[in-house]
């Protein structure tokens, strides 16, 4: 897995409200908040362009981020990101503190391997169906992976991979499976391709049409 460094310089903001947030955006800053753990929530201002560039990386949404302000470094994970409805702009970010020795509760993306070469696709003409694209996990910060890999190379048409089939890295626990066996949901499957019914000659006969042989029999009667 690639090692990416998400280090963000921040400043503590004291002005709050819509007006203050609007002024920040005019200065190419984006408002954010850091909360959770043993500390109080802290309102922050971040460099918009830098954060926007980081948002292009999938790992930004599941990786530990370092926020630097007031001469200290604070580790956190991104919990929410709000975007402008039609402009390529971020409008707000929520970060949750990461504390050493305390488990994180976050979502992890799934990477599906061998989708085009899977047995059920290449040999049987099946179609891959993704039932989920990420999973909810708990994990210690030191064991947090960037994503989970799901290899479907051996799947045939009709086969399904469930949560219990996933190969989990050390220390990773799936939240859904802690709720009971009935939460072992499907992750990915291969289904048979949809076959459209071919139109037959009988299907094309209009309701009022009568085959010639039947018409002749009727005349003889």
UniProtKB/Swiss-Prot annotation:
Residues 192-221 are annotated as: Disordered. Part of the 50S ribosomal subunit; part of the 5S rRNA/L5/L18/L25 subcomplex. Contacts the 5S rRNA. Binds to the 5S rRNA independently of L5 and L18. CDD domains: Ribosomal_L25_TL5_CTC. GO terms for biological process: translation. This is Large ribosomal subunit protein bL25. This is one of the proteins that binds to the 5S RNA in the ribosome where it forms part of the central protuberance. It comes from the Bacteria. It comes from Idiomarina loihiensis (strain ATCC BAA-735 / DSM 15497 / L2-TR). One of its GO terms (cellular component) is cytosolic large ribosomal subunit.
């Amino acid at each position: 897995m690639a090692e990416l460094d998400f280090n963000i310089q921040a400043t503590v903001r004291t002005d709050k409200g819509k007006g203050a947030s609007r002024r920040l955006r005019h200065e190419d800053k984006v408002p954010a908040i850091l909360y959770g753990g043993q500390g109080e929530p802290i309102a922050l201002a971040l460099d918009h362009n830098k954060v926007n560039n980081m948002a292009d990386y999938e790992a930004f949404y599941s990786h530990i981020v370092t926020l630097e302000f007031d001469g200290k470094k604070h580790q956190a994970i991104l919990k929410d990101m709000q975007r402008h409805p039609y402009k390529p702009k971020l409008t707000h970010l929520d970060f949750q503190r990461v504390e050493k020795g305390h488990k994180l509760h976050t979502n992890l993306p799934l990477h599906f391997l061998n989708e085009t070469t899977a047995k059920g696709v290449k040999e049987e003409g099946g179609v891959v169906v993704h039932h989920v694209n990420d999973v909810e996990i708990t994990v210690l910060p030191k064991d947090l992976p960037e994503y989970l890999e799901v290899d479907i190379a051996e799947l045939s048409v009709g086969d399904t991979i469930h949560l219990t089939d996933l190969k989990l890295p050390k220390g990773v626990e799936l939240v859904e499976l802690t709720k009971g066996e009935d939460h072992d949901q499907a992750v990915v499957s291969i289904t048979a391709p949809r076959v459209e019914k071919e139109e037959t000659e009988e299907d094309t006969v209009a309701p009022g049409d009568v085959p010639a042989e039947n018409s002749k029999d009727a005349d003889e009667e």
